[in-house]
From Swiss-Prot:
It comes from Dehalococcoides mccartyi (strain ATCC BAA-2266 / KCTC 15142 / 195) (Dehalococcoides ethenogenes (strain 195)). Gene3D superfamilies: YggU-like. Pfam families: DUF167 (PF02594). Belongs to the UPF0235 family. SUPFAM superfamilies: YggU-like. GO terms for cellular component: cytoplasm. SMART domains: DUF167. This is UPF0235 protein DET1292. InterPro entries: DUF167 (IPR003746), YggU-like_sf (IPR036591).
Amino acid sequence: MPAKESPFRVNLKILPSAQRNELTGYENGLLKIKIAAQPEKGKANKALVDYLSELLDTPKSEIEICRGLSGRNKVVAFYSLSQADFEAKISAILRGS
């Protein structure tokens, strides 16, 4: 498999075991996301990638959790999404557009 291009990375704070998946905004420089899945056996991590893929219209294969696989603070890499596109999509979602 060929090496991927340099990704755009974002710092996230994940709150597992929520009632539903939800993007809630920024807190202390981290994008805060609630995930309904339990934090066991990678379920919350898989649910996070699934949610981000759907939310940002980006293939799951282009999203990777780089750091924080077992913690709430994570670094996620996007290989096919630029920082500008990411920020525009997140801003639109947070505004309710």
